[in-house]
C-alpha cells in the first residue's frame, strides 16, 4: 500500500511540474507493461481509468506487453517513455548491452521479493526445491522467473532440471 501511495505522489508531483511548464498541456507518456493486463497492472491502469494522470497533466497510455525483456527493449529504444519489468531482466539487459548509452534504470520497486514460483501437483512428490532434480519444467523463454532459476537452483542445491 505504501508503494502505491509513493507511486501516486511521485506521479502527481511530476504532473504538477509538467503541467506548469507546459502551459497546462497534457504531457504524453507511453508506458509499456511487462505482460498482459492482469492484477499487478492495476497499479498503472487504475489511475488512467480514474483520470488521476489526466488531472495531473499527464496523458498516459498503458500498453500490454509480451515479457519483461521486451518491455526493457522498447524503453531502451525510445519507443516507450517508461515501463514495468522484472529486475532480473533489467540486469540481464545491462550485462548484455554495455554499449547502450541510455540504458533503462529502475526507479521504483513494486514487489518486496520476486513473485516467481514453481508449481507442481501434489501427486508429483515435489515438496522442496531439491525434489526438482531430474524433473522437467516449463516456462516461456522470456519469463523473469525462468531466467533467475539458475540462481535459485544453485542456492538450494538443486541438480539438473
How does the language model describe each region?
Residues 1, 25-26:
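Absolute protein N-terminus
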Residues 3-8:
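N-terminal export leaders
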Residues 13, 23-24:
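Cleavable N-terminal signal peptides
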Residues 27-160:
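Short, glycine-/small- and polar/acidic-enriched structural segments
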Amino acid at each position: 500500500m505504501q508503494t502505491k501511495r509513493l507511486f501516486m505522489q511521485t506521479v502527481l508531483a511530476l504532473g504538477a511540474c509538467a503541467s506548469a511548464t507546459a502551459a497546462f498541456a497534457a504531457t504524453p507518456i507511453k508506458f509499456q507493461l511487462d505482460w498482459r493486463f492482469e492484477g499487478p497492472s492495476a497499479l498503472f491502469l487504475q489511475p488512467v481509468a480514474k483520470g488521476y494522470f489526466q488531472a495531473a497533466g499527464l496523458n498516459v497510455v498503458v500498453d500490454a506487453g509480451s515479457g519483461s525483456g521486451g518491455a526493457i527493449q522498447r524503453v531502451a529504444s525510445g519507443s516507450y517513455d517508461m515501463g514495468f519489468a522484472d529486475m532480473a531482466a533489467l540486469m540481464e539487459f545491462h550485462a548484455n548491452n554495455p554499449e547502450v548509452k541510455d540504458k533503462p534504470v529502475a526507479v521504483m520497486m513494486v514487489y518486496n521479493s520476486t513473485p516467481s514460483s514453481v508449481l507442481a501437483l501434489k501427486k508429483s512428490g515435489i515438496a522442496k526445491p531439491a525434489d526438482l532434480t531430474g524433473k522437467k519444467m516449463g516456462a516461456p523463454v522470456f519469463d523473469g522467473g525462468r531466467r533467475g532459476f539458475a540462481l535459485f537452483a544453485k542456492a538450494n542445491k538443486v541438480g539438473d532440471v
